[in-house]
Amino acid sequence: PPEGDAGTGMAATNSIALHTGNISAGTSVFAMIVLEQPLSRVYPEIDMVTTPAGRPVAMVHCNTCTSDLDAWVRVFGEMAAAAGANLEKPRLYDILYEKTLEADADCGGLVNINYYSGESVTGLDEGRPLFVRRPGARLTLANFMRAQLYSTMATLRIGMDILFKREHVLLSKLLGHGGLFKTPVVGQRLMA
């Protein structure tokens, strides 16, 4: 289903049973996991909500997900059009996403920070998208696109690590929805 608000995503993915969850990934990104019990303490990175039946749900919400990625896809679309290859937007996304499957696991040393806006999970008040690399990094299209996709997920990982490493939350099924998952396999594989 398309990205929606927290309640819509929970219902649309049927992520209301114990140890299930969903990730909504579009302009912003959030993960919601149904818990056995409330967390042991308050974490500023995690919001607590409930299922319709009242079970506790941990929600990690990040303000920026695909905005920076979308900007780069537009640039590549402009380049393709300038070369006479007018690609439909979904095809352009598929080409660029699928290219990430050829990338180095570490993105060849490329790093992207996708913050278009402030990010409470990392304590930043304002966004500053940033792409960096060392002179010896492997700058390829595959590595560049993987760095872009990883940046959509990196901040979410901070909150998820709190749930799994500090709170020992159990998860048996996690379903993804939203624009990040429109191209089959790629978003799911990298998010996993």
Give the residues covered by each predicted segment.
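Active-site core segments that coordinate phosphate-bearing ligands/cofactors
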Residues: 1-192
